[in-house]
């Protein structure tokens, strides 16, 4: 009998896609899922404003001199902040998009052992970090270890 179920990576990436629908960012909807070694979901996160602040979808983006929105907390950071540090150790982060270099540093600092994502970042800045953490891209539903 053939098992037609999605792999764990596909399963959690699909959940990350659904989580991204809660994003309040006008530019890009990002979702992520933080998963323990035994495949239990520890937390989810999406990009949006900090608690109590106005959302970009309501007030527009609050941009700095470089044109980047400073109101938004990234999905990865929202998930990491939702979990006690001892639970994050050796976990896997599934994300709709490749984490930026700032989130990547936080991911490594949090003790997360692996990142699996769908949409690559437009530059290869994270190639530097791939020697410190397992980095997997699902590009066109094909798994590529980086």
Predicted regions and their residues:
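Zinc-dependent deaminase catalytic domain
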Residues: 1-146
């Amino acid at each position: 009998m053939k098992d037609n179920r999605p792999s764990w990576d596909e399963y959690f990436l699909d959940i990350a896609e659904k989580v991204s629908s809660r994003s309040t960012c006008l530019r890009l909807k990002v979702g992520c899922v933080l998963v323990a070694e035994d495949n239990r979901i520890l937390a989810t996160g999406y990009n949006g404003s900090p608690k109590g602040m106005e959302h970009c979808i309501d007030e527009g983006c609050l941009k700095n001199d470089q044109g980047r929105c400073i109101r938004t907390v990234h999905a990865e950071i929202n998930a990491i902040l939702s979990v006690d540090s001892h639970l994050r150790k050796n976990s896997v982060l599934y994300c709709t998009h490749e984490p930026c270099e700032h989130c990547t540093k936080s991911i490594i600092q949090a003790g997360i052992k692996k990142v699996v994502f769908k949409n690559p970042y437009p530059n290869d800045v994270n190639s530097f970090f791939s020697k410190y953490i397992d980095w997997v891209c699902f590009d066109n539903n094909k798994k590529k270890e980086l």
